[in-house]
Amino acid sequence: MPDSQPQPSPSSSSGGRQDPSALLLCGARLTDGRTVDVRLGGGRIEAVGTAGSLASAPTRGSRVDLSGYLLLPAPAEPHAHADTAQSADTDGPVSYAPEDVQRRATEAALLQLGHGATALRAHVRVGDVQGLGALGAVLQARRSLRGLAELTTVAVPRLLTGVAGADGLAMLRDALKMGAAVVGGCPDLDPDPTGYVEAVLELAAEHGCPVDLHTDAADPGRLARLAAQCGGLRPGVTLGPCGALPAEHASRTADQLAAAGVTVVCLPQGSCGAVTGRGTAPVRLLRAAGVRVAAGSGALRDVSNPVGRGDPLEAAYLLASREGLRPEDAYDAVSASARAVLGLPEVRVEAGFPAELLAVRGERLAGALSLAYSRIVVHRGRVVARTSAVREYCNSAVAAESGLPRQGRGEVS
């Protein structure tokens, strides 16, 4: 692949002024094996050239040495639960006071940002005793994260049909007016799943927003009806985690989902509170049928899943190790496909594309998915997070004689 040609920067088009926030990434390795310099400006990739070719140009802005790093399009998190994240770490009953929800949501988003996710979609329950309090807290967290990461919210009502569902429907309308960007929910928990989906789709069409629904897909007939209802809706419908889809119905169901243009978000790291079971969707079968499949984290250290790292690369690793995906396809599920779920533009390490990047210590993608400890995260053309890992071994005769690679400064006691 040839080097990308330089693109004019919006910041340099007026009076020759140069962008002080411009960034030059030097000596990064790409997945195709090239070692390159990458110049960023105005939130986009301005140029990609052979290593040393851009570094020799007159210096403007900052430089980051990425020797020994693999440079990738940044991943995204398509399925988080911001209102319950990290609630298992607290003693006693979980507090849903707005300040506590905001703190947990912010900490969880920063954790995932440190792993590389510069954009996140967070499901937030609305209605019942919480009303819109948790949503308001997560929206406040969204504002506090501005410039670091993009956080969008999904309003998740419990019931939408019958007498009990009237309040839920009113609450959902208020949530959209308040700032929720996506209509969500769990039709499997409603006495009338078909009516639930109809209400969601009607409201989404009215507001022109996406739909993102929870389902374990245990009832293939219900899933088929859901797919038929969702077909053709724009800007799109996402389902997940579909971890209980019966094997004997999986192939036909996959064809129905593909025909409807529905995206499936699987959760390789675990389940979430709105569904039961710990299975994983049949990823390879869905992909073979033409279904777009993305991967997310789901619950993060809450009552339904008290562990978890919220790491997109771990999700990709699990897709490769458990589901047999090639590392490239596994990473696509947490990057390109995940960004598509969020309605975000494509990212490539080429001139003209958004400067949403992740640099991980390593030479090849398979190794990065296995041992990606040190990371540098770029959002809108600037470094927003760094993680540095140093492994040290004590001095020993075996290490000295065998010439094993070591990091460290002297003996570790």
Where are these regions (language model features)?
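Histidine-rich, glycine-flanked metal-binding segment
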Residues: M1-L72
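C-terminal cap of metal-dependent C-N hydrolases
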Residues: V349-S413
